[in-house]
UniProtKB/Swiss-Prot annotation:
The gene is HINT3. One of its GO terms (molecular function) is adenylylsulfatase activity. This is Adenylylsulfatase HINT3. It comes from Arabidopsis thaliana. It is an enzyme of class 3 (hydrolase). Possesses adenylylsulfatase activity in vitro. Coiled coil: none annotated. The keyword Ribonucleoprotein does not apply.
Length: 197
C-alpha cells in the first residue's frame, strides 16, 4: 500500500509526458483564492509537502481545466479513464470531515458544470463521482479532493454489479445502526445541521 501511495504522489509531482517548460498546454496554477484580500492563499493554509498545495502555489505543473477563488479542477496525472479529473480546494484540508461545509458546497456546485464539459469532451456516456476519504478508503493524497471519472459503456473499469453486495436486513443490527447515526447527528450543533436559506 505504501509503494502505491508513493507512486501516486510521484505521478502528481512529475506528470508523464513532455517537459512542462516546452509544452504550452501545461500550466502552473496561481494561488488566487481571495482569502487574504490580495488574491493570494495565505501560506499558513497550505502544507509544504502536499502535492496539491504545491500545484496551488505554482511549484508543480498541472493541466488545469477550471479555476475560481475556492477551487480548481485539474486532470489526474494517473487517470483511471481518459479525462479523469480532480476538483481540489485551494486551502489545505486533509479529510472531508475537516473541510468546511462552505468549501465542500463550492466544490460540489462545480460538479455539474465541469462533469458535463468533461463528458462531452471525452465522448463519454456518464461519469463516476468519487471521494476517497481516509487511508482505509484508498485516500493517498491527504488534501480533500473529488474525482470525476468519465465512463463509457463496456469500459471494463468497474461496475457496481461486480461488487459483492448484500440485501439490507431490516433487523436489530440495522435498527441499532440507524439509532447510532441519529445520536451522532443529534449531538452536532444545530447550525451544522441547518442549511442556509
Amino acid at each position: 500500500m505504501e509503494a502505491r501511495r508513493l507512486a501516486i504522489l510521484c505521478s502528481h509531482l512529475n506528470p508523464p509526458g513532455p517537459n512542462p517548460t516546452r509544452d504550452p498546454t501545461l500550466r502552473v496554477s496561481d494561488c488566487s483564492s481571495g482569502s487574504s484580500g490580495d488574491g493570494k492563499v495565505e501560506s499558513s493554509t497550505l502544507q509544504n509537502d502536499c502535492v496539491f498545495c504545491k500545484i496551488i502555489r505554482g511549484e508543480s505543473p498541472c493541466l488545469k481545466l477550471y479555476e475560481d477563488d475556492m477551487c480548481l479542477c485539474i486532470l489526474d496525472t494517473n487517470p483511471l479513464s481518459h479525462g479523469h479529473s480532480l476538483i481540489i480546494p485551494k486551502l489545505h484540508y486533509p479529510t472531508l470531515e475537516e473541510t468546511p461545509p462552505s468549501v465542500v458546497a463550492a466544490m460540489c456546485s462545480k460538479v455539474p458544470l465541469i462533469s458535463n464539459a468533461i463528458v462531452k469532451a471525452t465522448g463519454s456516456d456518464s461519469f463516476n463521482l468519487l471521494v476517497n476519504n481516509g487511508a482505509a478508503a484508498g485516500q493517498v493524497i491527504f488534501h480533500t479532493h473529488i474525482h470525476i471519472i468519465p465512463r463509457k459503456e463496456r469500459d471494463c473499469l468497474w461496475a457496481s454489479e461486480s461488487l459483492r453486495r448484500h440485501s439490507l436486513k431490516l433487523d436489530k443490527e440495522a435498527s441499532q445502526l440507524v439509532s447510532c447515526v441519529r445520536r451522532h447527528l443529534c449531538s452536532l450543533p444545530e447550525e451544522q445541521l441547518v442549511q442556509p436559506s
